[in-house]
Amino acid sequence: MTVGIYQEIEHFVPGCEQEERDRAVMLRFLHEHPDALLRENESAHLTASAWVLSPDRTRVVMVWHNLYRSWSWAGGHADGEEDLLAAAMREVTEETGLRRLRPLTDGIFSLECLAVEGHEKRGRYVPSHVHLNVTYLLQSEDAALREKPD
Protein backbone atom coordinates (compact mmCIF):
# COMPACT_ATOMS: atom_id res chain seq x y z
CA MET A 1 0.00 0.00 0.00
CA THR A 2 1.27 3.41 -0.83
CA VAL A 3 0.91 6.44 1.33
CA GLY A 4 -0.78 8.26 -1.56
CA ILE A 5 -3.78 5.94 -1.70
CA TYR A 6 -4.16 5.96 2.07
CA GLN A 7 -4.00 9.78 2.14
CA GLU A 8 -6.44 10.15 -0.75
CA ILE A 9 -9.02 8.03 1.08
CA GLU A 10 -8.19 9.65 4.44
CA HIS A 11 -8.78 13.15 2.99
CA PHE A 12 -12.05 12.17 1.31
CA VAL A 13 -15.00 13.96 2.92
CA PRO A 14 -17.85 11.46 3.32
CA GLY A 15 -21.27 12.63 2.16
CA CYS A 16 -23.23 10.22 4.34
CA GLU A 17 -22.88 7.70 7.16
CA GLN A 18 -22.33 4.82 4.72
CA GLU A 19 -19.30 6.56 3.20
CA GLU A 20 -18.01 7.52 6.64
CA ARG A 21 -18.13 3.92 7.85
CA ASP A 22 -16.82 2.45 4.59
CA ARG A 23 -13.95 4.96 4.67
CA ALA A 24 -12.99 3.74 8.16
CA VAL A 25 -13.12 0.10 7.00
CA MET A 26 -10.92 0.92 3.98
CA LEU A 27 -8.33 2.83 6.00
CA ARG A 28 -8.08 0.03 8.55
CA PHE A 29 -7.78 -2.60 5.81
CA LEU A 30 -5.10 -0.61 3.95
CA HIS A 31 -3.12 -0.22 7.17
CA GLU A 32 -3.27 -3.95 7.93
CA HIS A 33 -2.91 -5.42 4.40
CA PRO A 34 -0.02 -4.32 2.18
CA ASP A 35 -1.51 -6.44 -0.65
CA ALA A 36 -4.82 -4.54 -0.69
CA LEU A 37 -4.27 -3.51 -4.33
CA LEU A 38 -4.12 -7.13 -5.50
CA ARG A 39 -7.04 -9.43 -6.17
CA GLU A 40 -4.86 -12.23 -4.79
CA ASN A 41 -6.00 -10.93 -1.39
CA GLU A 42 -9.08 -13.13 -1.30
CA SER A 43 -10.83 -11.42 1.61
CA ALA A 44 -10.94 -7.89 0.13
CA HIS A 45 -9.08 -5.67 -2.33
CA LEU A 46 -9.28 -2.21 -3.86
CA THR A 47 -11.28 -1.58 -6.98
CA ALA A 48 -11.61 1.62 -8.98
CA SER A 49 -14.64 2.83 -10.88
CA ALA A 50 -16.20 5.92 -12.39
CA TRP A 51 -19.49 7.57 -13.05
CA VAL A 52 -19.10 8.88 -16.61
CA LEU A 53 -21.15 11.79 -17.94
CA SER A 54 -21.75 12.50 -21.63
CA PRO A 55 -20.04 15.52 -23.21
CA ASP A 56 -23.16 17.65 -22.65
CA ARG A 57 -23.65 16.18 -19.13
CA THR A 58 -27.20 15.06 -19.88
CA ARG A 59 -26.55 11.31 -19.90
CA VAL A 60 -24.57 8.82 -17.82
CA VAL A 61 -22.75 5.73 -19.08
CA MET A 62 -23.85 2.44 -17.50
CA VAL A 63 -22.62 -1.09 -18.18
CA TRP A 64 -24.44 -4.40 -17.83
CA HIS A 65 -22.70 -6.55 -15.21
CA ASN A 66 -23.03 -10.23 -16.16
CA LEU A 67 -22.19 -11.54 -12.67
CA TYR A 68 -24.85 -9.46 -10.89
CA ARG A 69 -27.27 -9.34 -13.84
CA SER A 70 -27.76 -5.62 -13.33
CA TRP A 71 -26.66 -2.22 -14.62
CA SER A 72 -23.76 -0.50 -12.90
CA TRP A 73 -21.15 2.19 -13.33
CA ALA A 74 -17.90 1.10 -15.05
CA GLY A 75 -14.96 -0.14 -13.04
CA GLY A 76 -12.80 -3.03 -11.98
CA HIS A 77 -9.79 -4.30 -10.08
CA ALA A 78 -6.83 -2.05 -9.32
CA ASP A 79 -4.52 -5.00 -10.14
CA GLY A 80 -1.59 -3.39 -8.36
CA GLU A 81 -2.11 0.06 -9.92
CA GLU A 82 -1.33 2.66 -7.26
CA ASP A 83 -3.03 5.49 -9.17
CA LEU A 84 -6.69 4.59 -8.68
CA LEU A 85 -7.90 7.38 -10.97
CA ALA A 86 -5.75 5.90 -13.76
CA ALA A 87 -7.12 2.44 -12.94
CA ALA A 88 -10.70 3.75 -13.12
CA MET A 89 -10.03 5.44 -16.45
CA ARG A 90 -8.41 2.23 -17.79
CA GLU A 91 -11.47 0.21 -16.73
CA VAL A 92 -13.87 2.70 -18.34
CA THR A 93 -11.93 2.47 -21.61
CA GLU A 94 -11.82 -1.34 -21.49
CA GLU A 95 -15.55 -1.64 -20.77
CA THR A 96 -16.93 1.11 -23.00
CA GLY A 97 -14.34 2.07 -25.60
CA LEU A 98 -14.37 5.68 -24.37
CA ARG A 99 -10.84 7.10 -24.48
CA ARG A 100 -11.12 10.85 -24.08
CA LEU A 101 -11.98 11.14 -20.40
CA ARG A 102 -11.38 13.87 -17.87
CA PRO A 103 -12.05 14.09 -14.13
CA LEU A 104 -14.79 16.50 -13.07
CA THR A 105 -13.69 16.64 -9.42
CA ASP A 106 -10.35 16.97 -7.65
CA GLY A 107 -10.38 13.51 -6.17
CA ILE A 108 -12.65 10.74 -5.03
CA PHE A 109 -16.37 11.11 -5.81
CA SER A 110 -17.62 8.29 -3.56
CA LEU A 111 -16.52 5.23 -1.56
CA GLU A 112 -18.29 1.88 -1.31
CA CYS A 113 -17.58 -1.48 0.32
CA LEU A 114 -19.27 -3.91 -2.06
CA ALA A 115 -19.93 -7.54 -1.16
CA VAL A 116 -19.09 -10.02 -3.92
CA GLU A 117 -20.63 -13.49 -3.73
CA GLY A 118 -18.57 -16.54 -4.63
CA HIS A 119 -18.72 -17.29 -8.35
CA GLU A 120 -17.02 -19.01 -11.29
CA LYS A 121 -14.83 -16.89 -13.54
CA ARG A 122 -13.03 -18.38 -16.54
CA GLY A 123 -13.48 -21.87 -15.10
CA ARG A 124 -12.09 -21.00 -11.67
CA TYR A 125 -13.97 -20.51 -8.41
CA VAL A 126 -13.62 -17.05 -6.86
CA PRO A 127 -14.58 -17.06 -3.14
CA SER A 128 -16.85 -14.44 -1.58
CA HIS A 129 -14.97 -11.23 -0.81
CA VAL A 130 -15.34 -7.45 -0.54
CA HIS A 131 -14.48 -4.81 -3.12
CA LEU A 132 -13.16 -1.68 -1.42
CA ASN A 133 -14.33 0.56 -4.22
CA VAL A 134 -13.12 4.08 -4.96
CA THR A 135 -15.31 5.96 -7.45
CA TYR A 136 -14.38 9.02 -9.52
CA LEU A 137 -16.59 11.38 -11.55
CA LEU A 138 -15.52 11.69 -15.19
CA GLN A 139 -16.74 13.36 -18.33
CA SER A 140 -16.32 11.74 -21.72
CA GLU A 141 -15.45 13.80 -24.76
CA ASP A 142 -16.32 10.78 -26.97
CA ALA A 143 -19.78 10.19 -28.38
CA ALA A 144 -19.39 6.56 -29.50
CA LEU A 145 -19.44 3.51 -27.21
CA ARG A 146 -18.38 -0.07 -27.85
CA GLU A 147 -19.56 -3.28 -26.24
CA LYS A 148 -17.29 -5.53 -24.15
CA PRO A 149 -19.10 -8.90 -24.07
CA ASP A 150 -17.72 -10.25 -20.78
Label every PLM stretch briefly.
Residues 33, 42, 67-69, 74, ...:
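Glycine-rich, flexible loop/turn motifs
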Residues 37-73:
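N-terminal strand-loop-strand
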Residues 1-17, 21:
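N-terminal domain-onset segments
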Residues 10-13, 47-58, 132-144:
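Phosphate-binding glycine-rich loops and adjacent basic patches that engage nucleotide phosphates
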Residues 14-49:
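Acidic, metal-coordinating catalytic segment for phosphate/diphosphate chemistry
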Residues 1-3, 35-45, 86, 122-132:
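Short charge-dense sequence patches
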Residues 79-150:
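Unchanged
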